[in-house]
C-alpha cells in the first residue's frame, strides 16, 4: 500500500499541495480526478521522485520513499508523464528497451530483450516491434510507452493523463489494459479528466480541488451531482446505462 501523510508542496510562495492524506490499495487500479491546476501532476512528480518531498511523508509498504535509491526506486515506480516526444525514428523495440537502462550497465542482455518481447505481448502490440515509433498513432505510442514501463518490472505504475488525445477506441482499450495490469500484481494509479471512464474502469477514485483532497460526505455517491459540482464547478446529471452510472454535464451553466 502507498500511504501519503501530511504532504505539502509549494513552488516558491505558491502552495500547490495542502495537507494531502491518501492511501492507494496495492494491486488495484486507482484514479485521481480534478480540475486543471489542482495539484495532481505535482503529486505524481513527488511520488515518482522527480521532485523532493520536503514537508510530509510518502511510504510504500511502510517504508519511506526517501529510503529507495537508484535501482530500488526504478524497481518501485514506473512513470508515464503527460508529454513524451521522440523526434528520431527509433524502432519500437529500441524505445522499449530503454526501460531496462537502470538494470543494464552495458549493452542489453538476452534477458532484457526477452522482457521487451513479453511486454509487447502483454499489451497485444508485438506486431509493432520493428516499426519506427514516429510512424505510430497516438494510441499506439501510449501503449509503447507503457511497455517501456513494464520492462522495468515496477511495483507501481503512475500515469499522468494516459487517455489524452486518444480516440474512443484507444481510450477504452487502454483503460481495459490498465485494469488488467492491476490484476497482474501491478498497482496502477492514473490522473484523468474524464470521470465517466474512471467510473467504468477504476477500482478506487480520489478527488482533488484547489490543491487538497476532497471526499464525498458519508453515504454520498461519488456520482452525486452536488459532490461533482464541488469538484468541477459544473452542474451534472446522473444517468443509468446497463446498470452503470454515468454523469452528463448540464450546459445551462455556460
Predicted regions and their residues:
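Catalytic Walker B motif of ABC-type/P-loop ATPase nucleotide-binding domains
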Residues: 157-161
Amino acid at each position: 500500500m502507498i500511504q501519503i501523510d501530511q504532504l505539502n508542496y509549494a513552488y516558491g510562495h505558491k502552495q500547490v499541495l495542502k495537507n494531502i492524506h491518501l492511501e492507494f490499495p496495492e494491486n488495484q487500479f486507482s484514479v485521481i480526478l480534478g480540475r486543471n491546476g489542482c495539484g495532481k501532476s505535482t503529486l505524481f512528480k513527488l511520488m515518482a521522485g522527480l521532485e523532493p518531498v520536503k514537508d510530509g511523508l510518502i511510504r510504500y509498504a511502510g517504508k519511506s520513499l526517501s529510503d529507495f535509491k537508484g535501482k530500488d526506486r526504478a524497481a518501485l515506480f514506473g512513470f508515464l508523464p503527460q508529454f513524451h516526444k521522440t523526434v528520431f525514428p527509433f524502432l519500437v523495440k529500441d524505445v522499449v528497451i530503454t526501460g531496462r537502462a537502470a538494470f543494464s550497465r552495458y549493452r542489453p542482455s538476452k534477458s532484457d530483450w526477452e522482457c521487451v518481447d513479453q511486454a509487447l505481448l502483454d499489451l497485444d502490440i508485438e506486431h509493432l516491434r520493428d516499426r519506427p515509433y514516429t510512424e505510430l498513432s497516438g494510441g499506439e505510442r501510449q501503449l509503447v510507452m507503457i511497455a517501456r514501463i513494464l520492462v522495468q518490472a515496477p511495483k507501481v505504475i503512475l500515469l499522468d493523463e494516459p487517455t489524452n488525445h486518444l480516440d474512443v477506441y484507444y481510450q477504452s482499450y487502454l483503460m481495459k489494459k490498465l485494469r488488467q495490469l492491476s490484476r497482474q500484481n501491478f498497482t496502477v494509479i492514473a490522473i484523468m479528466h474524464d470521470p465517466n471512464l474512471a467510473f467504468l474502469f477504476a477500482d478506487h477514485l480520489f478527488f482533488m480541488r484547489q490543491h487538497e483532497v476532497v471526499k464525498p460526505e458519508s453515504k454520498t455517491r461519488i456520482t452525486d451531482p452536488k459532490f461533482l459540482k464541488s469538484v468541477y464547478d459544473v452542474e451534472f446529471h446522473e444517468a443509468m446505462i446497463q446498470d452503470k452510472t454515468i454523469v452528463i454535464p448540464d450546459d445551462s451553466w455556460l
